[in-house]
Amino acid sequence: MPGARSEAGGVDNPLVLDSSDSDDNLSGLPLNGRVKRIDGNDRSYKKKSLTSMRKSTVVDLTLSDSDEAVESVNLLPGSSSTPDRAAQAGISDKQPSLRRRPRPFMSIADSSSPPENQNVISFLGNHSQEIGELPSPPLVEDRAAPNKMELGGENIAGQNNEANAAQAAVPVSGTPSLTLSSNRPQSVSGAQLVVASSSRSAINSPPRRTPSIPQQSPSSRATPCRSASIASSRSRPPTPPLPATQSTPVTVSRRLASPILSPVQAVSSAIISPTIPSIPSHASLSDPTILSPPSATSAPPNSPIPSTSTTVQTPAAALTYARPSTSAAPLPVMPISVTPATTSPAGPGPSALQSASEATKSSDQKESPRKTNSKQPSSPSSTHGRWTDTRLFHTPSNLSATSGKSSAASSRSKSRAPLSSRAAMSDNVAGPSKTTSVSSTHPPSRASPSSLPSQSQRQVHPRPPSRDGVGKREKKSKTLSSGTGQSTPSKFSLPTSDVASNQKNKSTGLNALPKKPSSTPTSSIPQRTSTLATAMAIRPFVRSPTPPSPQSSSEASRSIQTSRGAVKAAQNQDKIHPLSTALSISSHSREATTKATTLFHTTSSPPSPSQSTSAPTKSHVVWNAQKLGTTVLSSERIHLSRGKSQTSDSVVAPAASQTAASLSYPAGTSGGAREADKKAVETSFHAGPSSADFEAFVQPSTSAIAPTTVRPSVAPPEDAPVLKSGSIIHPLFRAASAIGDQNAFTKTEAVGDVLSQGSKGRASSPRITTTGAVSHLAPHVDLGSKIKPTAAPSLFASGVTTKNVDDQDSAQPQNQTPLPSAISVSSKKNHGSLSKESSIKSAASFISSSSTLGDSVSGLGRKSHHKSTQSMPQSPLPTTNTNNSSGIEVNSWLNPQPFGPSFAASHLSIHAKKKWKERERGKEREKEKVREKEKAEEENEQLRQRRIADLEKLSANLELYKRRMDVESRTRSIPRADGETRKRPPSPGISVSTDAEVRVVKRSKPTWAIAPEGGHVAPAMEKESANVNKKAADAIKINHQPASSYAPAFATPASPAKATRTPLSVTAGLGPPVNSSSSTSTPSLLSRSINLGILRDKPKDHMDDDDGDDSAGGLPVRKTGKNGAVEEQVEQVRLDLDDVSIHGSSPAAPLSIFTSRFRDVSITPSRIQKTLEESDNDVPIQRYAVKVNGKQKAQRSKDKSYGSESENDVPLNWPSRKGKGRTAPEPQDSSETQRDDDDVNLGSGDGEERPSDDDSIPVPPAPLFKDRTAHVRQPLQTLFKGGIVAKHSYQRPLAKASAVSPVPSANRPSPAPSAKADLLPQKRKRRLKKITSQQWQHIAQNSLSDVDDLLGESSKKRLSPENAEKLGADLSKLTRPRVFSIVSRSEPRTKREPIEEDNNEYFTDSDSHTSDVALFSQHPDPPPPPERIREAKRNFDTRNIDPWNRQKHTFRSNPALHRAIFEAYIMQSTSMEESGGDDIKVTNDVDADGGPPDFEFVYSDTMLYPDGIPPPELGLGCDCDGPCDPDSETCTCVKRQELYFYDLGLKGFAYDENGKIRENSASIWECNELCGCPPECMNRVIQRGRARDTGIEIFKTKEKGWGIRARSFIPSGTYIGSYTGELIREAESERRGVTYTAIGRTYVFDLDGWQIRHPPKGLEKIDKRAAELAEAVKMRARAAMRESQEDAYNAYSVDAFHYGNFTRYFNHSCDPNLAITQAYVKDFHPERPLLVIFTRRDIKKHEELCISYKGIPDDDDIPSPEPVKKKKGGKGKKQMSKTSASAHPPEMTALNSDKGLVEVKDICRCGAKNCDGRMFNYGP
């Protein structure tokens, strides 16, 4: 009935739902879940109404093994029909799906998750089966339900009860389902339900800064919401109406109604608490041991309803297990009983429970509102689920449990209800060492009305909050009454649960706890238990129970009455299971006779680190006998499992005939100021066979339950909630906590599963004391599950009680008498034989099989990631020291020598031995390095000696050759083998014979020939002529030839001309030359090739007429009537034929140094191939003589033995003289050729006779080149920065020199003939030929040489302006250089395989570095797994910066606007990358215009991978389900990080619990997207970005340009940012460094971390892929360092010139306050770390943030795993840390068009004490 009010004047049952989906026209909803038909009969909805539930956080509290679970819809009475009511309630056949933000954590229950994830749903569901609707506690993060948790159970409900069974599901998150109008509260049976829901977590998201604002519902403006028991206090303001909130999903099964949870707003001290209707009288009782309530009676019309009372109605026949709609396996739950004693101070009359019970009989009955007597003295009212102290403790209702600000639970959403402004207090105490206790009460004793303080007394004496953070223990026993703060002396000591104040405990992070009136022993049980027993024991105590008012034992005993007949009737039902978890709430009449009651309580507190792990735990059982109350305090020692939990595949299921015990605790207080208060009314919560339908009740057996204590076998995992931003409760206890209100639950911090703050920021385990009769629940275990069950701990019986574990006292268990356990099948027979000193002791094998619930039942369902702390070691401790005179147990932490007397000595000995072995290994490594160095020096010396010997032989051969070819000055004749002397050719006037003589050269294949223009290449003859002198076979024989003009000619087909065979000494392996510089990207790739293909200017000068009729040079000469003897050309050709390595396949084949002497060279593959096929070994060669300088030079050979192939013939392997001769021509086509079939022809000169036009073409057509292969094989090559140097067979260069670079023919001037032909290199000072400006520009553009190479070896790496002028270099016209193949100055000793560029797809022509290609080819990376490869950002987008640059001129006149636009540009660029950081401001107080920096770069916080760079690769992820534990032994990320700590002695992650870096000299390995941990993991600091409180700004300095400074105080170790930019190779960084040197700025940082070349040992055990990469990188680093002779290696660099973020503005300081380290976040390749920046020390406000371009400055402060020997002298680099990153140093010289090369201004202006005046480190 909308708007109906009870007689008490309050809204009876305002079902608060989400206003978004509510319907104002809906009628009330009964709590029992039944739908009332018009005829009065009960009717239940079938399954199809809510069969499909959305994947949301829903807890289904129903259990059943039946496949056909019947679901009922909780509809409101008053509807005409069931479908209509369903429509009014907003229920559809398919549950609507509300789009909800996904959660990275688990969700407590998921209606669409697999069955193994539904056990928590089933586990929690039983709490609300008979309550109907329960309030929700403050929420934590939704987490995934435990996996593989499947427990067996039976359908214990009889068929007779199925018709009346009503089971409910309690949702805990806001999703749409049943909706009602929260603005119009509904009246249902006179019961009020106040619940709270949440749609957001309190853990994973930071709390909002605006607290929730209480709202009022328009339907309840006149009368505040009240309960049904006692009138509200006059001092409390009226309770506000319930606001409209989001709806919550309801999953129903069987015939139960769906309880609705929704938030409640509370104002001031008014506390809204649920009132639960009483139990119908027709409920049946199934077990005699279950506490059952008496029949309910009608409530009088004038009974007052206090705002803090609680009444609960139990649905009828809620005894059946109903399988949830998600097919979750049933989970047996510990039977519990909650007994809040609540009385009305208004005199005799029916209680609120009876009124509520009567109200349920007719759901549409209206009750007239009752007026509250404001003059009536306030009596102790009951706040369900919360304790209150005798003194008021006023605190803001919405304060967090730790910070005093708005709690996360209340500030997450507007729909969450704020906490009550009045914080209830308790006298329980939390010890000084992280203790949080929750205790229940003994049976309340009789309290006289006179002992209660008046209202004024309660207002005058408030209790101030505790300032020391921890409440103190009171020795004096007290009993507290809920809601009034009154206390009366009681017969029994009444322990109460702790209620935290708003004062934060400094040591634990918890709130201060009030004093405890009783020193009841508590136990130490780790939080988040791993056994079913512990989980069951915690369950009823999630919400702090309300203590009863003091009352006598007789009154307490009258609170529960049972009927033996009803019990017997219930036992006759076959299918009633003893483990039924129906939660029944009994209401008792005043006339009921006094029976017995059993009360239990739980204490939750973390253990003291100094106490033994086997400290005995306590359990407290309060037995109220018929006339006498007896307190049973038992103790037992629980030994934690110190290793991994043992698993067991056997499961012992409980017998169906077992009798389930009932655990009960008071849920309310009783007491009053009148005589009528003596008849207290108590309400019991209990689990087991329902007794709600029985009117008669049976007294339960006092021995039904044996007190016991259980402890988990494993430590709590890391993902357990920690009190950081408010009260945090594990999701397992959300629905179960509905027995208390929002305030009470929030203030009880450590109930059940709340963690206290540990010493290192990790959660400590609270102590949990439970009671017996819980270990008998042996659920079904899925043997196929991956998560194996955990064995239960050993249990011992003991009658000795101990003190709190925080008191540092522990006692040995005495009288360890094994007692019958509820686990045993025969335990039901022993219920009556249990004494108060008895306890449970279970056999190890039996417990391991029956307690295999482990983490499954406790809500974890996953393996533990929490390593035990010092108080709970994982491994078993040695027990050698058995004789302990101090009486302390061996394993106790109080034992000074727990490992025996000799353990310390042996341990130290082992430690010293280990250190000694490490030192020895270090010495061996040093010796090995020395040996390697000596070996390298010895090999180098051998190479040098061999080089000297080769040079000596070469010099001797050259001298011999010069003597042979010495030309007589007068006769100009050449001696022949037959002794004749050839005369000079006749004068041009003499007629010339048309028959030319052809000289045949004896060669080995392949050969090439040069024939006269009109002649043809004659086929080689197999035998020589008879006239050949065998002794002079190596000499040159030249026949008489007619006079001719001597000019080069093509190799043409041989003609039948007269030929003379002349064997010629050739070097083995000669062959045709190969074009090596035809490629624009690699012009000098071949070491033994000739630059070919460019036409030369044909010589126009002719020889003078001179006497002589002989040819010159021993080659065929065509006499044309002119003096055509050209010794120079003849000798040049001879040398080319003898010593030039053109095609040699032998490794000893050298490079010709006379490549520049070729005049006209072309490649004719097809023609030469045809010639070679037709020819044999002998190929005729003919060449025309050419006139040089108008003179002829004759040469003669004085040694006829020249040309013989002997051992003295050494290849000519000296470098070419720079500037001498002409530069090698460059081919006009850009394609490269293959060496195997190419050949060389010498072009024709200006001879008058040309046989054909085809022969006169010096260069073949272009198609000959286009079909050639694009790559040239290059074995045994040596390439230097300046060009090509010949290489010997031992792979060492002779000297560093530059080859003459090719110059395009268009830019080459006409060659001037030399006055003197220096055919051979002389041992004299080299003369440099002046290079033109075009030649210099061509060299610079093609990176063929550098300044040092052009000057030769005597330049000493410096080029003076005079030398630059001599070279004629025009340095002002330098353009952007191009990347070519250049290697370092020294060559590795090992031979390399031929390099193919196609082997590595990431090396392109524009970024090809011979050293990189060689290294990556020789030591390639193994292929990456596809699942680890991620997409790289290849291109940067300029769409953001281009509009700013286009509009820059418009806002330069307004500096403020200009700066604002720059700030907006940064914010726009990083909106999707670093959204959590504070905005970056720009300040300019130096410049007159005050503008920001130029928009010259693209702003981004992501690394850019240009084309040619491999994509990022992720590392192996961990399998942690929650935040990673730094002490975990299974987390892969922790193990990998510890390896990279090397010898720093650090454990865990690189960060502490506050996100601060612990050591900035070690590399950081964060978790990645392959890990299972959430974003809140402590190992994801860089991924979360810069914190919002870390404010920075870009400001203009006076001398250093732009810089960065702090806007606020920044502590040490804070993450500032990442140095992002373009990831480029080392070759590219070298090339860009030239440009940056010219402009005076550099933004290049080298990735040269120490860890790159020193991978840790044992990495292959953690990540095999990472170990393979590290090994390949290590080999490349060694090879590169051996080549460059440097101490550092970096394959990549980061350039932030065109692409980066604010870190590019950091200036240099020799004493920086920032440290750059290398981290692996999104790319785990060892060579590609991310440069991250942290603070080295505390930074003040407005202090400039600086880094060091040299790396970390002080070597002594940096620990290194190996001793580092510093180099002598000050030019070497300092040893960097393991991750030190230094800026790429610019070139020492800068280019200047006027002054040549000048010094770079490398001046440091930091002003530090250790400043050396330089900003960069330069190598040797």
From Swiss-Prot:
Any one Gene Ontology MF annotation carried by this entry is: zinc ion binding
Loss of this gene results in the following: Severely decreases localization of DMT5 to DNA. Decreases methylation of the fifth carbon of cytosine (5mC) in DNA; simultaneous disruption of UHF1 exacerbates the effect.
Which residue windows does the record flag with biased composition (Basic residues)?
1765-1776
Q: List the disulfide bonds.
A: none
Give the residue ranges for region: Disordered. Answer: 1-54, 74-251, 284-618, 634-681, 804-836, 850-893, 911-944, 966-996, 1063-1126, 1183-1270, 1296-1335, 1385-1407, 1756-1794
Which residues lie in Polar residues bias regions?
Answer: 109-129, 174-204, 212-222, 374-385, 433-442, 479-510, 643-662, 810-827, 869-893
Q: Which PROSITE patterns match?
A: POST_SET, PRE_SET, SET
Which residues does the annotation say bind Zn(2+) 2? Answer: C1518, C1533, C1567, C1571
Q: Where, by residue number, does S-adenosyl-L-methionine bind?
A: K1600, G1601, W1602, Y1643, R1704, N1707, H1708
Compositional bias segments (type: Basic and acidic residues) = 361-370, 917-944, 966-983
Where does the Pre-SET domain start and stop, copy by copy? Answer: 1516-1585
* Subcellular location as annotated: Nucleus; Chromosome
The entry's Zn(2+) 4-binding residues are C1710, C1804, C1806, C1811
The positions annotated for binding Zn(2+) 3 are C1524, C1567, C1573, C1577
Catalytic activity reads: N(6)-methyl-L-lysyl(9)-[histone H3] + S-adenosyl-L-methionine = N(6),N(6)-dimethyl-L-lysyl(9)-[histone H3] + S-adenosyl-L-homocysteine + H(+); L-lysyl(9)-[histone H3] + S-adenosyl-L-methionine = N(6)-methyl-L-lysyl(9)-[histone H3] + S-adenosyl-L-homocysteine + H(+)
Give the binding site residues for Zn(2+) 1.
C1518, C1520, C1524, C1531
* Keywords, alphabetical: Chromosome, Metal-binding, Methyltransferase, Nucleus, S-adenosyl-L-methionine, Transferase, Zinc
Which ranges carry the SET domain? 1590-1750
**Biological processes, Gene Ontology terms:** methylation
Question: Which positions carry the signal peptide feature in this UniProt record?
Answer: none
Quote the Gene3D superfamilies the UniProt record gives. SET domain
Family per record = Belongs to the class V-like SAM-binding methyltransferase superfamily. Histone-lysine methyltransferase family. Suvar3-9 subfamily.
Notes on the domains: In the pre-SET domain, Cys residues bind 3 zinc ions that are arranged in a triangular cluster; some of these Cys residues contribute to the binding of two zinc ions within the cluster.
Q: What role does this protein play?
A: Histone methyltransferase that specifically dimethylates histone H3 to form H3K9me2. H3K9me2 represents a specific tag for epigenetic transcriptional repression by recruiting HP1 proteins to methylated histones. Mainly functions in heterochromatin regions, thereby playing a central role in the establishment of constitutive heterochromatin at centromeric regions.
The protein's name in its UniProt record: Histone-lysine N-methyltransferase, H3 lysine-9 specific
Q: What is the taxonomic lineage of the source species?
A: Eukaryota, Fungi, Dikarya, Basidiomycota, Agaricomycotina
